[in-house]
From Swiss-Prot:
Interacts with DNA gyrase. PANTHER family: DNA GYRASE INHIBITOR (PTHR40055:SF2), TRANSCRIPTIONAL REGULATOR YGIV-RELATED (PTHR40055). It is found in: Cytoplasm. InterPro entries: AraC_E-bd (IPR010499), DNA_gyrase_inhibitor (IPR050908), DNA_gyrase_inhibitor_GyrI (IPR024911), GyrI-like (IPR029442), Reg_factor_effector_dom_sf (IPR011256). It comes from Pantoea sp. (strain At-9b). The keyword Aminoacyl-tRNA synthetase does not apply. This is DNA gyrase inhibitor. Inhibits the supercoiling activity of DNA gyrase. Acts by inhibiting DNA gyrase at an early step, prior to (or at the step of) binding of DNA by the gyrase. It protects cells against toxins that target DNA gyrase, by inhibiting activity of these toxins and reducing the formation of lethal double-strand breaks in the cell. GO terms for molecular function: DNA topoisomerase type II (double strand cut, ATP-hydrolyzing) inhibitor activity.
């Protein structure tokens, strides 16, 4: 797995925040977002922003934002039922990987193991996120960028 430290800009987004087990909330959130995006003919980067450590937080307390990036000046119409937010920029530990058979858990575990081998960076309190480069919703196979927020030790 090839990894690097990258500097990412802040990214504005529209999307849905859901709470509960990620294997349920991520597909649900993207289904909602896909419908909303189709009605508004928007284009952007599809991402999932994760809140909570699944090794210590019970599944029902995990949160995810399923989002599409938008320009900074994007304005939502009142009553749309969708949220608008900003993903913080800064340093991130990055990899581009292929997930097979929807096994995101193994991909994240391997990615975190790579970061733990480094002594010069540590995880900070911003959320981890995925940027999808392909739609694997039918096949279960995904190409994506994964990002872990970091700060120097």
């Amino acid at each position: 797995m090839k990894t690097s430290i990258v500097e990412r800009p802040a990214q504005h987004w529209v999307g849905y925040r859901l709470q509960g087990p990620w294997q349920e909330t991520v597909p649900q959130g993207f289904a909602q977002l896909k419908d909303w995006v189709a009605r508004h003919a928007l284009q952007g980067e599809w991402m999932a922003i994760y809140y909570g450590n699944p090794q210590v937080v019970p599944p029902q307390e995990l949160s995810v934002e399923t989002v599409l990036t938008v320009p900074a000046d994007f304005a939502l119409a009142v009553g749309e039922g969708i949220q608008h937010g900003t993903l913080a920029g800064g340093h991130y530990f990055h990899t581009c990987t292929e997930v097979q058979n929807n096994d995101f858990f193994s991909a994240w575990n391997a990615f975190f193991a790579q970061l733990q081998q480094r002594s010069d960076w540590q995880v900070d309190d911003r959320p981890c996120y995925e940027h999808y480069l392909s739609d694997g919703s039918q096949s279960g196979n995904w190409l994506l960028n994964m990002y872990i927020p970091v700060r120097p030790v």
